[in-house]
Amino acid sequence: MSEPTSSRPAYARLLDRAVRILAVRDHSEQELRRKLSAPVMGKNGPEEIDATADDYERVIAWCHEHHYLDDERFVMRFIASRSRKGYGPARIRQELNQKGISRESTEKTMRECEIDWSEMAREQAVRKYGEPLPSNFSEKVKVQRFLLYRGYLMDDIQQIWRNFAD
Protein backbone atom coordinates (compact mmCIF):
# COMPACT_ATOMS: atom_id res chain seq x y z
CA MET A 1 0.00 0.00 0.00
CA SER A 2 1.68 3.16 -1.20
CA GLU A 3 0.88 6.48 0.45
CA PRO A 4 1.33 9.88 -1.16
CA THR A 5 4.64 11.41 -0.16
CA SER A 6 3.00 14.61 1.11
CA SER A 7 0.73 12.83 3.63
CA ARG A 8 3.31 10.25 4.76
CA PRO A 9 5.59 12.71 6.58
CA ALA A 10 2.63 14.41 8.29
CA TYR A 11 1.20 11.04 9.35
CA ALA A 12 4.60 9.83 10.55
CA ARG A 13 5.17 13.02 12.54
CA LEU A 14 1.72 12.78 14.09
CA LEU A 15 2.24 9.13 14.99
CA ASP A 16 5.63 9.86 16.53
CA ARG A 17 4.15 12.73 18.52
CA ALA A 18 1.23 10.59 19.72
CA VAL A 19 3.54 7.82 20.92
CA ARG A 20 5.74 10.34 22.75
CA ILE A 21 2.69 11.91 24.43
CA LEU A 22 1.30 8.52 25.48
CA ALA A 23 4.69 7.30 26.71
CA VAL A 24 4.64 9.88 29.50
CA ARG A 25 1.19 8.94 30.88
CA ASP A 26 -2.20 7.68 29.76
CA HIS A 27 -4.49 10.21 28.09
CA SER A 28 -8.12 10.11 27.06
CA GLU A 29 -8.86 10.13 23.35
CA GLN A 30 -10.12 13.72 23.54
CA GLU A 31 -6.94 14.86 25.33
CA LEU A 32 -4.76 13.18 22.72
CA ARG A 33 -6.72 14.77 19.87
CA ARG A 34 -6.34 18.20 21.49
CA LYS A 35 -2.61 17.78 22.02
CA LEU A 36 -2.03 16.45 18.51
CA SER A 37 -3.89 19.36 16.92
CA ALA A 38 -1.99 21.96 18.95
CA PRO A 39 0.91 23.67 17.16
CA VAL A 40 4.38 22.25 17.79
CA MET A 41 7.09 24.59 19.04
CA GLY A 42 9.90 24.62 16.52
CA LYS A 43 13.11 26.60 16.29
CA ASN A 44 11.27 29.50 14.66
CA GLY A 45 8.19 29.47 16.90
CA PRO A 46 4.95 27.47 16.69
CA GLU A 47 4.66 25.25 13.61
CA GLU A 48 1.43 23.78 12.31
CA ILE A 49 1.46 20.16 11.17
CA ASP A 50 -0.01 19.97 7.68
CA ALA A 51 -2.00 16.83 8.49
CA THR A 52 -5.47 16.04 7.21
CA ALA A 53 -8.40 14.92 9.35
CA ASP A 54 -7.85 11.43 7.93
CA ASP A 55 -4.26 11.46 9.27
CA TYR A 56 -5.54 12.26 12.76
CA GLU A 57 -8.13 9.47 12.56
CA ARG A 58 -5.52 6.96 11.38
CA VAL A 59 -3.16 7.90 14.22
CA ILE A 60 -5.95 7.55 16.81
CA ALA A 61 -6.99 4.20 15.31
CA TRP A 62 -3.36 2.99 15.34
CA CYS A 63 -3.00 3.98 19.00
CA HIS A 64 -6.21 2.10 19.90
CA GLU A 65 -5.17 -0.94 17.87
CA HIS A 66 -1.74 -1.16 19.52
CA HIS A 67 -3.17 -0.48 23.02
CA TYR A 68 -1.39 2.82 23.48
CA LEU A 69 -4.74 4.55 23.89
CA ASP A 70 -7.38 2.96 26.12
CA ASP A 71 -10.01 5.16 27.76
CA GLU A 72 -11.03 2.44 30.24
CA ARG A 73 -7.44 2.02 31.46
CA PHE A 74 -7.09 5.81 31.60
CA VAL A 75 -10.21 6.15 33.77
CA MET A 76 -9.03 3.44 36.20
CA ARG A 77 -5.61 5.01 36.61
CA PHE A 78 -7.03 8.53 36.84
CA ILE A 79 -9.47 7.55 39.61
CA ALA A 80 -6.71 5.77 41.53
CA SER A 81 -4.35 8.72 41.15
CA ARG A 82 -6.83 11.41 42.14
CA SER A 83 -8.19 9.41 45.09
CA ARG A 84 -4.62 8.94 46.39
CA LYS A 85 -4.28 12.73 46.26
CA GLY A 86 -7.34 13.05 48.49
CA TYR A 87 -10.03 14.02 46.00
CA GLY A 88 -13.57 12.73 46.28
CA PRO A 89 -15.88 11.13 43.74
CA ALA A 90 -17.73 14.32 42.70
CA ARG A 91 -14.51 16.13 41.82
CA ILE A 92 -13.10 13.10 40.00
CA ARG A 93 -16.31 12.75 37.97
CA GLN A 94 -16.16 16.42 37.01
CA GLU A 95 -12.52 16.18 35.92
CA LEU A 96 -13.19 13.04 33.86
CA ASN A 97 -16.12 14.81 32.20
CA GLN A 98 -13.79 17.68 31.27
CA LYS A 99 -11.39 15.15 29.76
CA GLY A 100 -14.11 13.80 27.47
CA ILE A 101 -14.94 10.58 29.28
CA SER A 102 -18.57 9.49 29.09
CA ARG A 103 -20.68 9.51 32.23
CA GLU A 104 -21.52 5.80 31.79
CA SER A 105 -17.85 4.83 31.61
CA THR A 106 -17.05 6.95 34.65
CA GLU A 107 -19.90 5.49 36.72
CA LYS A 108 -19.04 1.91 35.73
CA THR A 109 -15.42 2.37 36.72
CA MET A 110 -16.30 4.19 39.96
CA ARG A 111 -18.41 1.17 40.99
CA GLU A 112 -15.57 -1.22 40.14
CA CYS A 113 -12.82 0.68 41.95
CA GLU A 114 -14.00 -0.35 45.45
CA ILE A 115 -12.82 2.79 47.23
CA ASP A 116 -14.40 3.53 50.61
CA TRP A 117 -15.12 7.21 50.06
CA SER A 118 -16.33 7.85 53.61
CA GLU A 119 -13.07 6.45 54.99
CA MET A 120 -11.11 8.57 52.49
CA ALA A 121 -13.08 11.64 53.61
CA ARG A 122 -12.29 10.85 57.23
CA GLU A 123 -8.58 10.47 56.45
CA GLN A 124 -8.55 13.86 54.72
CA ALA A 125 -10.38 15.52 57.61
CA VAL A 126 -8.00 14.01 60.17
CA ARG A 127 -5.00 15.04 58.10
CA LYS A 128 -6.24 18.63 57.93
CA TYR A 129 -7.89 19.08 61.35
CA GLY A 130 -6.30 16.38 63.52
CA GLU A 131 -7.67 13.70 65.78
CA PRO A 132 -10.24 13.86 67.35
CA LEU A 133 -12.37 15.57 64.77
CA PRO A 134 -14.19 18.71 65.92
CA SER A 135 -17.53 18.13 67.59
CA ASN A 136 -18.93 21.66 67.89
CA PHE A 137 -21.14 22.95 65.10
CA SER A 138 -18.96 25.75 63.71
CA GLU A 139 -15.88 23.50 63.46
CA LYS A 140 -17.92 20.70 61.85
CA VAL A 141 -19.10 23.17 59.22
CA LYS A 142 -15.47 24.03 58.39
CA VAL A 143 -14.63 20.34 57.99
CA GLN A 144 -17.71 19.80 55.80
CA ARG A 145 -16.87 22.78 53.61
CA PHE A 146 -13.30 21.53 53.17
CA LEU A 147 -14.45 18.02 52.22
CA LEU A 148 -17.13 19.32 49.85
CA TYR A 149 -14.46 21.41 48.13
CA ARG A 150 -12.32 18.27 47.80
CA GLY A 151 -15.23 16.56 46.02
CA TYR A 152 -16.72 14.33 48.68
CA LEU A 153 -20.47 13.76 48.82
CA MET A 154 -22.47 14.97 51.82
CA ASP A 155 -23.49 11.37 52.67
CA ASP A 156 -19.83 10.35 52.93
CA ILE A 157 -19.04 13.41 55.04
CA GLN A 158 -21.92 12.74 57.43
CA GLN A 159 -20.76 9.12 57.78
CA ILE A 160 -17.63 10.45 59.51
CA TRP A 161 -19.58 11.57 62.56
CA ARG A 162 -22.10 8.71 62.43
CA ASN A 163 -19.62 5.84 62.24
CA PHE A 164 -16.62 7.31 63.99
CA ALA A 165 -18.11 8.94 67.08
CA ASP A 166 -15.55 9.94 69.71
Curated annotation (Swiss-Prot):
Modulates RecA activity. It is found in: Cytoplasm. Belongs to the RecX family. InterPro entries: RecX_HTH_1st, RecX_HTH_2nd, RecX_HTH_3rd, Regulatory_RecX, WH-like_DNA-bd_sf. It comes from Salmonella newport (strain SL254). It holds the Pfam family RecX_HTH2. The lineage of its organism: Bacteria, Pseudomonadati, Pseudomonadota, Gammaproteobacteria, Enterobacterales. Keywords: Cytoplasm. GO terms for biological process: regulation of DNA repair. This is Regulatory protein RecX. GO terms for cellular component: cytoplasm. Its main location: cytoplasm. The keyword Transmembrane does not apply. The keyword Cytoplasm applies. It comes from the Bacteria.
